[in-house]
Amino acid sequence: MARTVVIGAGMGAMAAAARLAVAGHRVTVYERGPAHGGAVRRHERDGFGFDTGPGLLHLPAVYRDLFVKTGREPLEECVELVQVDPAVRHVFADGTAVSL
């Protein structure tokens, strides 16, 4: 099969690289940053933690499909999935809050 280059090591790029590798391609992933994960990062300041990218799996079926099609064990054997309700809560300076 073809030799394939994937630019970036975010979630989508890594999923594409995994699928290409399983299909028989020789895949090389290039990432300009110090770590893989793309926007999935965490910033801490003054005792507070801030997720700078996606922190929830809103569509776990997509990840299950990726694990199955790349020959991995089932998703639930690799990570613990916990339903979160509400998924997010935003509190504004005036005290109002929105839960989603």
Locations of regions flagged by a protein language model:
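N-terminal glycine-rich phosphate/pyrophosphate-binding loop and immediately adjacent elements
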Residues: 2-100
